[in-house]
Design a protein with these regions (language model features):
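N-terminal anchoring/stem segment of glycosyltransferases
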Residues: 1-60, 183-184, 206-240
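Short coil/turn segments at beta-strand junctions that form active-site/ligand-binding loops
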Residues: 2, 32, 80-83, 89
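Short catalytic/ligand-binding loop motif for oxyanion handling, primarily in non-cytosolic enzymes
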Residues: 13-15, 43-46, 92-97, 101-103, ...
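A conserved donor-nucleotide-binding helix/loop in the catalytic core
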Residues: 16-25, 56-87
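Non-transmembrane alpha-helical segments in soluble domains
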Residues: 23, 27, 92, 174-178
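Short acidic donor-binding/metal-coordinating loop in glycosyltransferase active sites
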Residues: 39, 87-91
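Conserved donor-nucleotide/metal-binding helix-loop-beta segment in metal-dependent transferases, i.e.
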Residues: 94-128
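Catalytic core and acceptor-binding pocket of nucleotide-sugar-dependent glycosyltransferases
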Residues: 117-218
Length: 241
């Protein structure tokens, strides 16, 4: 079975309450070992059930850059199954599935570049996106795409294109991986990211097996926390007693 890898920031908000429910939700998907790439494990994690990878980000590295380096590390270190499952701490599997997926949906990368440029100006993340777009085009892909993914992401580690790297970075390695391995990407489906009560109702009504919380601190206010408490009242093997 495929191993699961979480790439976690440190510290986690609210001592990792979202991660706890994400781990409990893994019972709905067949999987191998669970790896966590992070400087420190939360103190409530059972260290005997989780493989801890002490990947230390550069001091003061921004979140996107830290995650990019972890993706690059994923493609160069053979410590887990080659076919792995990428998880974030706010991905929840709310009903049984046979495997992770589908692969992420997308929008053109230039849309994201324009959004960040308008919002932040000429900052490092914008330059990294521009570098990423340039590199993808140099590889013969006319319209670089940006993955939109808020559910378990199947990834073949040996297909992460670390050989693409030149000396003109930094890059977003998650975007590079997506473009390298998706010659015929899927169409955009409904969103499953919850930001408020009404969206939560719509997601549940569609019968999606996955849920994800927003990045704006509305985890409790959205009603998702209360729902997960009802769905997963019992601790998983990955939590201390």
């Amino acid at each position: 079975m495929n191993d699961i890898v979480y790439m976690l920031k440190d510290p986690l908000p609210d001592n990792g309450v979202e991660l706890g429910y994400s781990l409990r939700s893994l019972k709905h998907m067949p999987h191998g070992k669970v790896f966590m790439v992070t400087p420190r494990l939360p103190d409530w994690i059972n260290p005997y059930k989780v493989e801890h990878i002490h990947h230390l980000p550069t001091h003061q590295m921004q979140k996107w850059a830290d995650l990019g380096e972890k993706w690059k590390w994923l493609g160069t270190n053979d410590v887990m199954t080659d076919e792995a499952i990428y998880m974030d701490d706010d991905y929840f599997i709310v009903r049984p599935v046979k495997k992770a997926g589908p692969r992420p949906t997308f929008h053109p990368l230039w849309v994201l570049i324009e959004y960040y440029t308008e919002k932040y100006g000429d900052v490092e993340i914008v330059r990294a996106m521009q570098n990423t777009e340039r590199l993808i085009k140099e590889k013969g892909i006319e319209i670089p795409l940006c993955p939109v993914q808020h559910y378990p992401w199947p990834v073949v580690r040996s297909n992460i294109p670390v050989h693409w790297e030149d000396d003109k970075g930094p890059y977003d390695w998650k975007i590079l991986e997506f473009n390298h391995n998706n010659p015929n990407p899927p169409e955009y489906p409904h969103e499953n990211k919850v930001t408020d009560h009404e969206q939560l109702k719509r997601v549940i009504a569609r019968g999606t097996p996955y849920l994800s919380s927003a990045d704006d601190g509305s985890f409790v206010d959205s009603g998702l926390l209360s729902l997960l408490e009802q769905m997963f009242p019992e601790k998983s093997e990955y939590e201390r007693d």
